[in-house]
Amino acid sequence: MAKPLTDGERRKQISVRGLAGLGDVAEVRKSFNRHLHFTLVKDRNVATRRDYYLALAHTVRDHLVGRWIRTQQRYYERDPKRIYYLSLEFYMGRTLQNTMVNLGLQNACDEAIYQLGLDLEELEEIEEDAGLGNGGLGRLAACFLDSMATLGLAAYGYGIRYEFGIFNQKIVNGWQVEEADDWLRYGNPWEKARPEYMLPVHFYGRVEHSPEGVRWLDTQVVLAMPYDTPVPGYKNDTVNTMRLWSAKAPNDFKLHDFNVGGYIEAVLDRNLAENISRVLYPNDNFFEGKELRLKQEYFVVAATLQDIIRRFKSSKFGCRDPVRTSFETFPDKVAIQLNDTHPALAIPELMRILVDVEKVDWDKAWEITKKTCAYTNHTVLPEALERWPVSMFEKLLPRHLDIIYAINQRHLDHVAALFPGDVDRLRRMSVIEEGDCKRINMAHLCVIGSHAVNGVARIHSEIVRQSVFKDFYELEPEKFQNKTNGITPRRWLLLCNPGLAETIVERIGEGFLTDLSQLKKLLPLVGDEALIRDVAQVKQENKVKFSAFLEKQYGVKVNPSSMFDVHVKRIHEYKRQLLNCLHVVTLYNRIKKDPTQAFVPRTVMIGGKAAPGYHMAKKIIKLVTSIGNIVNHDPIVGDRLKVIFLENYRVSLAEKVIPAADLSQQISTAGTEASGTGNMKFMLNGALTIGTMDGANVEMAEEAGAENLFIFGLRVEDVEALDRKGYNAHEYYDRLPELRQAVDQINGGFFSPREPDCFKDVVNMLLNHDRFKVFADYEAYVACQARVDQLYRNPKEWTKKVIRNIACSGKFSSDRTITEYAHDIWGAEPPALQTPPPSLPRD
């Protein structure tokens, strides 16, 4: 009888190293047909378009798994410091094309699919966006995952596998209507369920103090089931993991609560536990304070920390037994980055595990926690800051409330010792806010419990230091940093704008795709006639393509020779879509007043979602669609001005509209947009920016030269001065006839003849309580737009500025951002050693 295999031999038998890569066209075809038959159980007679998409997805996924396993093996062998990026949002978009691009498979797949009589682009369109985010925060997390994999960092994204992502937006009679985003309806070929790593998460219960320590008892348990999605780096054979948790009820859930007859009710009530991962809260920059949301925040943190500690304790290859019992080295092996305050409970939860479970003494546990955690602040808007009622914690997380009180007491003792007698400072710096309803300030908890706190653009980090966390900065100035946001050039150039990428590669090679600073090599070519021609031609092709898409999707005809003026982002008062509306109405009035004048034709596109409960944002959408209805059907205006609301703006739509844009609108009130990343995407794709000195616009102007952007409006210090003086919108309304005309038309029902009073509340807000000072910037904005028109009339000079902007956008790669995080915050340098491809032997 054959001798039984050793563990090592058995592992070699199922190793992926022996599998040949499927890079060539014939292999892709073969694999595609195999999946169509054996995975999907279809033949070409009955297969649907979705079957073809799934067959291709599985074919491409086959290329990932070897690298994925190999990457994880290598991490277990080398035991590098792990980076854990905790976020309640990951706005990933589609996966198929990104995976083909990062693995260098796109050409082979394109040819194979063509030979099979199918169209690759058509199949790509079938994939649902993974819309597990609201906007910038979630998309940043997705770009960061791409960069961490491309840099070879041992990084993991941890979040929630929402059954329903950000709602689908329909426009009905000009109003936003929300539809559920059932993105998992047809299954998700990119994820792998990992039931063997399912973990319990506790809620409610009571706290018992005894000589042996503290116990949290009589809790309700919900299980967290992990689903893993591969995150491939760009052509480096590294594949990292995004692990998303899904809530499952335990098998005995509620059964003991019922008498003999209650079995069916108990099974039906399992839904209550599983609701935790049901839906993404659709609020952007707004705190609502719902108990289910707090449950989501604790759920992801509790499951993730158990997973992190399991991996820390058994972090050598092939070993599931605990090998580390001491937590001394925990901060040397683990970095936890908190993406905003949503995962703030990681701080008290790590303390609970260390003190209650692992029996580490408090001071040591606190030192470990602080060295491990770091916090990124994403907003300065007061309504966005998370402040949870103490009463909710008392009920839901009683042990964590105790721990937060203890953290706060020690913190305040420290402050009192440094600033004796300064009672107001203690009040300002406390984690607990006193008042009618006692609240926990999660941002304060994050600052106290982290070794590093960063803002996301230089101007924002300055506001964080001087205003939002001024007292904390005075206490620990060395803790505060800036890390200007970035975007991945793989998705936001190579994937979405292959024509422009190719034009650049022809001039400077392809090194810029992993070192975006190399775009500087284009600077000497700014005046090169051939480059000017090629860049302009690519832009025109993108505009023609997007025009065809608009006609097909929305039945809207636009003139691709007009200026594409694009304003796409979440609908929010601070982002000032209303300022754009006032300019559009002003242009309309000018055309009507003198139709014989030479106007630069414009297609104004505005897109974005409004939070379902945000009345003013929904009114803004209605206003845009109403203005469009009048302007677009006015025969005197004709082709010179069109206003289009881009329905259901999402990652996959951004990938189409951004490469086609001529003008990028980034017009938030100075001091309100933390960074913005859409601004960077437009810059990289050859649009010029009209914007205020806010967020990353400031650094874009610094990189490219302010004369190569259209900068207008109040600066932060002007806004502050206006606040001190008192902002009076009526001054501008009375002084500026064009503004007054536009406002009166909106107020009087000119754009809403069937509902003349529709926009009275909008105008009332603008005149009497506009926090974001739309009228104060109107005059400068309209004048700046005239400069835009003037330059657009000179295509060559316009394109020169475009090339200069592209050449100066290198700073805004998320690779640069992540390299800075790794060096300055995580203490984990990107490795020089790449992961060998799965077909090479391990060293």
UniProtKB/Swiss-Prot annotation:
Catalytic activities: [(1->4)-alpha-D-glucosyl](n) + phosphate = [(1->4)-alpha-D-glucosyl](n-1) + alpha-D-glucose 1-phosphate
GO BP of this protein: glycogen catabolic process
EC number annotated for this UniProt entry: 2.4.1.1
Region (Pyridoxal 5'-phosphate): 677-678
A Pfam family per the record: Phosphorylase
Enzyme class: transferase
Residues that hold AMP according to the record: D43, Y197, R310
Cross-referenced CDD domains: GT35_Glycogen_Phosphorylase (cd04300)
Site annotation Involved in the association of subunits: residues: C109, C143
The protein's role, per its UniProt record: Glycogen phosphorylase that regulates glycogen mobilization. Phosphorylase is an important allosteric enzyme in carbohydrate metabolism. Enzymes from different sources differ in their regulatory mechanisms and in their natural substrates. However, all known phosphorylases share catalytic and structural properties.
NCBIfam families linked to this entry: P_ylase
SUBUNIT field: Homodimer. Dimers associate into a tetramer to form the enzymatically active phosphorylase A.
Full protein name: Glycogen phosphorylase, brain form
Organism expressing this protein natively: Bos taurus
